[in-house]
Amino acid sequence: MIRTFATIANRGPGIRLATLAASRNLGYSSGGRISSVRIEKLRFSPFRSSTSLRYTSDIQHVMQEADSLDVNNSVSNTGVLDYDRKNAVVLYFDHIYPFSVSRYSWKQYFTLLFPVNRCSEDDIRERVMNLSSTEKEPLPKDVRILELVPMRRDGGVFVKFQLPATMSARELVGLICQNTKENEQAYGERFLVGPLNKIWNHFPRCFQVKGTPWIEDLRRFPSVKLSVKFEGERLTEEELYVLFRRYGLIIDIAPGSGTEPAVIHFRKIRSAICAKNCVTGITLNSGNTVVHIQYLPLKRVNYITDFIGNHQRIAIPIILALLATAAVFIFDPIREWFIMQNVSHRHALDSYKDNKFLKLVSLPYEQVRRWIDSGYDYFDSKFGCDEEDEFGGEKGEAPNDLWSERYEKVKQLKLWIYENINTFIIVRGPKGSGKEELVLEHTLRDDPILGNKLLYIDCEALVKSRSDNALIEATAQQLGYFPVFTWTNSISQFVDLGVQGLTGQKSGLSESKETQLKNMFGLTSSAIRKLALQDYAKYKKSVLRQRRRQQGDSTSEDILSEDEYLSQHPERKPVIVIDKFAGRADGDQDFIFKMISEWSAQLVQSNLAHVIILTHDVGSMSHLTSALPNQVMKSISLSDASQRSARHYVLNQLNKESQAQVNELDSCLEPLGGRMLDLQAFVRRMRSGEAPGDALEEMVSQASEQITTFFLSASSTQNSWSTAQVWLLIKLLAKQESISYETLCHDPLFKSPDSLSILSTLEKHDLISLISDKGVLNTVSTGRPLYKAAFRSLVEDPKIFRIYEEDLYNKLIALENAKIAKLEDEFAKLASVDARLVRNRLDYVSNKIVASTDKITDYEEKISGLSSKKSSWF
């Protein structure tokens, strides 16, 4: 047996490692190492006066030299706690204050809310004395606290006790530490205090300060690891364990080598704090070793970021999916709520007009506004400067006479809504015919029930959006979709490119505008459904309550399903008004019409809403029929006002001086027809002082200029129509009220397959109007009544007539020449075949060539016959 002894003598005040013995039979492993070690008992020697010679270390000498002339040598200035070790002892109490593990630790600020943690110095003194004393073992009366040095960052306090004459330092320290433990045991026996003491506010502990503590307030926050530096000889791992184990459980000790510091890893941060404050500055090994201790910041490993960095192809899609899920769960309920408010107008100011508190503010405001308006009206009546309101009439006066003849259509529209049978209604009419006012003002908003749930969508505002972000913002504004983050589109595109470069696949974060709009309309459908079924829960409760009252009655009412409930209560369903719906649009936003038609058809098929579509375009029916192929759509057609209503409207808008020209008005109103926009423009011109004839002539001249600039411009190559086609329509409509589509198709200019699309485009621009019969195009008429006079003005102008008539004949000649060229090619091919076999075909081709040649000759004669004289077209 071999026994190895290691003795460390005089290793500082109160520490002596007596014997370290390891014994083992003479048996070595294959590696030549000792198999096991037995640690014998460690004995601690009492304090010796010789060990205190270097107790103060060199820091105190530096302090004395630097502060030899300084008056204030307190701990806060020097960082050194100086005391007479013969007459005083220093102890460290932990958990007096909440300690901070970082600069942004929330606990240090949260605990300040409680009065127990906002203690003054007197409170701390009293608390320390209570901890140090018990009823069985009270402190001697001559023991008092000489100085109290708080360490708020570490959560503890250094307490300097006066040493009584009847006790030694060892006895006083043992008494205080024992009393503190007994108080902790008594405190933990209280109800619910023990578990809470372990979780939240630990009971303070007491340790003797063995070294020279460095009282510093640097940004070095406590951690479970301590860095131990040695000045002089190093300590072994066993010696470090003996020195630090009393403060708490140690997980690991790294003794280091050379100049590297040793690292001690405690299980709890509380133990590390006590060890650092009590041991730092201690002198061991007869003054040959001085220990300096600092907190070692933990290098925390973030496994999440490590996983993301090492597994990008897996982590990035997961992160994006989580972000998308979080966005859906957070923002979609908010957006749905805003959509519901936009449809129901529940929080609009109009809904609070009967509130008594609001009336206290609104009634004085309304009275002052009436006084101001009456003053304006007085001056307007005196100086004749009455203005038109948004309807074209005088302020305070609406043109109800124009709507008297449409009263039956308003009744029919309301009847269809309350019938609740496939409420997909189409209101047609030319621009300026008052479709919006008929539906919104006279049908819905005047109704106290239907006007409560109304969603208005202007397709023109969506189609005219110049960018994708503008389209999304416009759609969100009309739907009430809030919040919307359009700036994320640009960021998502960059992120998508970056992810594709890193992982080789797209992240799917960026979405097309079509997908985003579908999501917005889908969320709107969900909000509309909630609004429609808002009172369904109350209905079920009322039926169940009635059943309980009528128990045993076989005639009790059955609970209707959601679809049956909405079928029997059409007033519960919101009304969706889609304005300015068209078949197609110029630009990249053309898809919006098809998307809205499919969305509205889904609402009608799901029995969630009434849909009313306002359109002036016949081509829009293609989207609607494809969205609802098996349903008959209800339609209301609006035309211009009658001549009598138009005359009555103009007379009501004119002042007394202008009414003297009533006889001249009748002849001027006939070319204007009943188009509201033209009537309002005519009234404005007469109010400005123009005579009726001059106003009409100027309006016709502007319309003619608009036609020649936009429709008859030869420089425009983007138009689908030709100048000759438009001029032919102008000539025919200037002479007739309407043209038969069958007759028009016989003209060479309209024999091409795209003639119908050209006519639809011209109708969209309000030049002509297409009238269908049983879904088939029947006649073509003028788009605006004013255009009829403009057509006649253009045809009657000799110069304009000669220019466009010659262009028309040249176009016809070009068509015939192209036809002859094809026939000549065919004739050349037939020449190589036996004439007896293709004699009939040769005769047919030759006759066609002769007929086309005769037409060309006739067209050329007409061109030569054109003169600058007045046109004889009429």
UniProtKB/Swiss-Prot annotation:
Keyword Nucleotidyltransferase: no
Transit peptide: 1-55
Superkingdom, taxonomy of origin: Eukaryota
Transmembrane segments: 314-334
Region (Disordered): 547-566
Keywords: Membrane, Mitochondrion, Mitochondrion inner membrane, mRNA processing, RNA-binding, Transit peptide, Transmembrane, Transmembrane helix
CDD domains linked: RRM_Yme2p_like
Bilayer topology: Single-pass membrane protein
Localization of this protein: Mitochondrion inner membrane
RRM domain sequence ranges: 224-297
MF annotations from Gene Ontology: RNA binding
InterPro entries registered for this protein in UniProt: Mt_escape_2_C, P-loop_NTPase, RBD_domain_sf, Yme2_C, Yme2_RRM
Biased composition annotated in UniProt, kind: Acidic residues: 555-565
Mitochondrial matrix face residues: 56-313
Record's GO cellular component terms: mitochondrial inner membrane
GO terms for biological process, alphabetical: mitochondrial genome maintenance; mRNA processing
Mitochondrial intermembrane side, ranges: 335-874
Function text: Plays a role in maintaining the mitochondrial genome and in controlling the mtDNA escape. Involved in the regulation of mtDNA nucleotide structure and number. May have a dispensable role in early maturation of pre-rRNA.
Family membership noted in the UniProt record: Belongs to the YME2 family.
Protein's UniProt name: Mitochondrial escape protein 2
Organism: Meyerozyma guilliermondii (strain ATCC 6260 / CBS 566 / DSM 6381 / JCM 1539 / NBRC 10279 / NRRL Y-324) (Yeast)
Encoding gene per record: YME2
